[in-house]
Each structure stands twice: as C-alpha cells, then as structure tokens.
C-alpha cells in the first residue's frame, strides 16, 4: 500500500525546493537593501546636509550672487549689491539673461538637482 517515490520524483522535488528557497532568499535580500536605502535617504543626517549644502538656485533670491571656483565672477551675472554664497564643491552654474531659463536645460549642473531625485 505504501509505494516510495521513484528517483525522478525525488530529484524534481529537490530542484523545486531549491528554486523556492532561492526565491525567498532573493526576496529577503531585496527587501533588506530597500529598507537600508530608504532609511539612508530619509535620515536627516548626511543626505539632507549634502542636499542643502550643494543646492543653490540663483533665481530664488535676486539679491544673491554665487561665487564659483574656476568660473566667471558673480558680478557678471548681477550688477547690483548682493549677498555672497560660496559654492566651491558644486559644479559650475550658468548665468542667463532671463532668470527662470538656463542656457542648457538638458544637462543641468549637479547643484541644481536634488540627490533624492529619481529614487
């Protein structure tokens, strides 16, 4: 009345259990990495400081000028008395005639993009 499994059935069960175990392992790995990345982006520490330090929009306050390392002077953009913000760690910002339009919209400098953008 009791008939043992043949060899093919045992091999099929072993392969199926291995695939199922690998799927659970990969799902756990993906969830672990997702939680670590989301915690890193939500933390008020380094990500927020780096975002605030490097994000400067020259068009938000017309009384600010931006002094860049190895770039044109800020007085070339604004001809009036202005507050000064030093941005040495950021890429070069572009001065335009109209404040809301940048010279090359397709490739904005990294200082005008949030580090959380696209995630």
Swiss-Prot record:
Primary localization: secreted
Q: Could you say which residues form the signal peptide?
A: 1-40
Q: What is this protein called?
A: Protein FAM24A-like
Q: Where in the cell?
A: Secreted
Q: Which UniProt keywords apply?
A: Secreted, Signal
Instruction: Look up the domain of life of the source.
Output: Eukaryota
**Record-level GO cellular component terms:** extracellular region
Concerning its family, UniProt says:
Belongs to the FAM24 family.
A Pfam family matched in the record: FAM24
Per the UniProt entry, the disulfide pairs are none
TM regions (residue ranges):
none
């Amino acid at each position: 009345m009791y008939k043992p499994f043949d060899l093919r059935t045992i091999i099929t069960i072993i392969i199926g259990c291995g695939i199922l175990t690998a799927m659970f392992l990969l799902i756990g790995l993906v969830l672990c990495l997702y939680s670590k990345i989301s915690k890193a982006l939500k933390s008020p520490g380094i990500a927020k400081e780096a975002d605030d330090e490097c994000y400067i929009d020259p068009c938000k306050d017309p009384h600010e000028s931006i002094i860049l390392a190895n770039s044109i002077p800020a007085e070339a953009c604004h001809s009036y008395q202005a507050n000064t913000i030093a941005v040495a760690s950021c890429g070069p910002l572009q001065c335009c005639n109209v404040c809301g339009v940048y010279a090359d919209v397709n490739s904005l400098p990294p200082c005008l993009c949030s580090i959380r953008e696209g995630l």
